[in-house]
Amino acid sequence: MTDKLIIFDTTLRDGEQSPGASMTRDEKLRIARQLERLRVDVIEAGFAASSNGDFESVQAIARAVKDSTVCSLARANDRDIARAAEALKEANRARIHTFIATSALHMEKKLRMTPEQVLEQARQAVRFARNLVEDIEFSPEDGYRSDPDFLCRVIETVIAEGATTINVPDTVGYAIPELYGNFIKNLRERIPNSDKAIWSVHCHNDLGMAVANSLAGVKIGGARQVECTINGLGERAGNCSLEEVVMAVKTRRDYFGLDVGIDTQHIVAASRMVSQTTGFVVQPNKAVVGANAFAHASGIHQDGVLKARDTYEIMRAEDVGWSANKIVLGKLSGRNAFKQRLQELGVQLESEGEINVAFAKFKELADRKSEIFDEDILALVSDESVTSEKEQFGFVSLAQHSETGERPEATIVFTVDGKEVRSSAEGNGPVDASMKAIEAHVRSGAEMVLYSVNAISGSTESQGEVTVRLQSAGRVVNGVGADPDIVVASAKAYLSALNKLQSKAERVAAQG
C-alpha cells in the first residue's frame, strides 16, 4: 500500500506576498474554491491576525470550503493564535499554523531572544493552540539554517505539546536537494517522538531549486507534506510550484511510490485563474502550465508525436486540463451553455445575479469578437464589476481622439463610490491620455512601476490583457483589465489597481 503525499497550498498566504500580488477577499474566495475543486488537502487561507481584511478572507474561506482543511498562519503568541482560531471557527476542518524563527541569525537580529526563550515560546504557543483546535502545524522559521541540536530540542518539545505537523522551511532558498533531504532525514532519526507528527517541507526558489528540494525532502527525508503555490507564486523568486511537484510525483510514481489526491484536470484552470487575478503572466516555457509545455516545433519531434505520443510526451496535455478544442462559445450561445462552461473552467460565482452580470458582459464581448476562448471567459469573470464586492472605482466608457502629428486626447467616464464622473486629458499616446484623465480626477499620486500587455488568444481580434502595477506609500498592487480595445483594457487595469490600492490602504489602517 502506497503512502499519500499531502498537498498544502499557500497561494493565498505566501503567494500573495509577491510584490503586487495583493488579492481582494472575493478574489481569494474564488481561488479557494478552485483549490478545493483541485482537491488540495490543505488551503492556507491567510494570516488572520495581520489585518481585518485578512481575517475576513480567512473567515469567508472557512465558511465556504467544505472538503479541504482550511489553515491560518499565526505567530507564536496568544493573540495571533486566538485570532486564527476565531477566523477558522466555522471551518469543517481547521488548522492553525504557528511559527517562530530558530536560526541563530534570526533569533539574535530579528527576535532579540535567547534560544531558551524561543524554545519556551514555541512550547507555550503550541500548547495554547492545541486547546483551540486539534490540527496544529509548527514551523521553525529559517529551519534549514538553524543549529540541528537546537532544532531537535524545539521540534521534540512542540510534538510533545501536540503539534501534528512539523514543517521545516528553507526560508531563503539556500538549500541543495541532497543536503536538504538528508537534513530532514537526520532530524526525523534523531528526534524520539518524530513518528507522532507528519513531516512537511516548504522551499523557496531563490536558487531555482524549490521543486527539487521539496522532492528530495520527500524521497530522502521522508516528508509526507509539500507546501507549494499555483504557478510557484511567492515573494522574491517564488515558492515550490504545485503543478510541477504534483506532476513529478504522479509521472514518476515508479520512483516516489506515493499517491496524490489532486484532480490534475483542474490544474490549468487554477493556473489561469491565479495568473489573471494577480497579473503575473505565466511564462510560455513554464513546465506543465506554460503555453509551450506541450508544443513541439522540431520536425523530428512532431513526426514522432504524430506516430506515437509517448515518443516525446511523458504526460498527456488533457490530464492537466489543456483542451484541444479551445473555441468554446459564440454570440449565439445561451446562458445555460455559458454557465456550464464556467463550471467546466472551475469558476463558481457567488450568486445568480453575478452570473447574469457575467453573461451580459459575455454577450457584449461576443458582439465584438467572433470567437470566444476559455481565456476570454476567465478574463471576463476576473473583472471586479462582475463580483458583488464593493469597488470604489468602476469603468463606464471611454472616448479617444488621435491623429498623426497631434497629441491624443481621451475622455473617460467612470464611477467613484457609485457616482459617475467625466474627465479628459491629453497624453503622449491614447493609453497615456486615458490614465492621465483618470488621475486628473482621482489624484492618487501613485507611481506606475509596470505596464504590460498580453494577447489572451492568438488572433488579431484577441482581447488584450493589461497589467498595471502601482506603488504608493510603500504599498505595491497589480491591476488587470481585458478588452479587445487596448486603451479600454488599460483604463480598466488602472482603475482595478486603484481599487486594490485603496483596499490595501484600508487594511493597513485597520491593522495600525
UniProtKB/Swiss-Prot annotation:
Using the record's annotation, list all stretches that form the Pyruvate carboxyltransferase domain: 5-268
* Keyword Zinc attributed: no
User: What pathway is it annotated to?
Assistant: Amino-acid biosynthesis; L-leucine biosynthesis; L-leucine from 3-methyl-2-oxobutanoate: step 1/4
Q: Which SMART domains match?
A: LeuA_dimer (SM00917)
One cellular component term from this protein's GO annotations in UniProt: cytosol
Q: Which UniProt keywords apply?
A: Amino-acid biosynthesis, Branched-chain amino acid biosynthesis, Cytoplasm, Leucine biosynthesis, Manganese, Metal-binding, Transferase
One GO biological process term:
L-leucine biosynthetic process
Q: Which reaction does it catalyse?
A: 3-methyl-2-oxobutanoate + acetyl-CoA + H2O = (2S)-2-isopropylmalate + CoA + H(+)
PROSITE patterns annotated for this entry? AIPM_HOMOCIT_SYNTH_1 (PS00815), AIPM_HOMOCIT_SYNTH_2 (PS00816), PYR_CT (PS50991)
Sites binding Mn(2+) sit at: D14, H202, H204, N239
Under NCBIfam families, the record lists: leuA_bact, PRK00915.1-3, PRK00915.1-4
Q: Describe the protein's quaternary organization and the partners it interacts with.
A: Homodimer.
Per the entry, what this protein does is: Catalyzes the condensation of the acetyl group of acetyl-CoA with 3-methyl-2-oxobutanoate (2-ketoisovalerate) to form 3-carboxy-3-hydroxy-4-methylpentanoate (2-isopropylmalate).
Tell me which family the UniProt entry assigns to this protein: Belongs to the alpha-IPM synthase/homocitrate synthase family. LeuA type 1 subfamily.
Q: What is this protein called?
A: 2-isopropylmalate synthase
